[in-house]
Amino acid sequence: MKKPFTVVQTVAKEMIDHNGHVHDANYNIVFSDAINQFNYQHGLSLQERKALNYTIFTVEEQTAYLSELIENDQFYISVYIYNYDVKRVHFFSIMKKQDGTTVATNEAMMLGISRATKKSAPFPQHFLDQIVSYYDNQERIDWPKQLGHRINISQ
């Protein structure tokens, strides 16, 4: 099994909010950037999107905040594929501190889009092949309870 696609970053001062930790919107930015980097390196670079008149949209996402990050903390995001079909990929990403503490998780559903029609369209074959290969060869994990979690207040 292959190690997951991973992006490493350090918390910059601009990411900090009035509570002294990373602002919630910045978690979503770094998760989105990690998935973009995954896509760029697996067959959907900006140049490939332009040449194919094709792109990929986020159609649903959810982030769970489990621990804090403060300025200068180093963290990494590991990207997993939970599921896919010919025009959708369900990503699950895990953000951890260098000591292994899980900081946040992010679940995102991405949908392939034809720029010509502005409608959903199957993935280009070379990208789908990369998704299938990644999924088949990724490290197997016990999916965290945050996967598929429904926001609710228990009564």
Language model segments and positions:
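Hot-dog-fold acyl-thioester-processing enzymes
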Residues: 1-58, 114-155
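Hydrophobic core residues within well-ordered beta-strands of beta-rich domains
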Residues: 5, 57-59, 75, 89, ...
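Generic short beta-strand
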Residues: 13, 92-94, 110
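Conserved GNAT-family N-acetyltransferase fold
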Residues: 31, 93, 106
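Hydrophobic beta-sheet segments that form the core/acyl-binding groove
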Residues: 61-98
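Long amphipathic alpha-helical scaffold regions
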Residues: 97, 109-111, 115
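Residue-level signal for glycine
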Residues: 100-102
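Short hydrophobic alpha-helix segments
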Residues: 106-108, 124
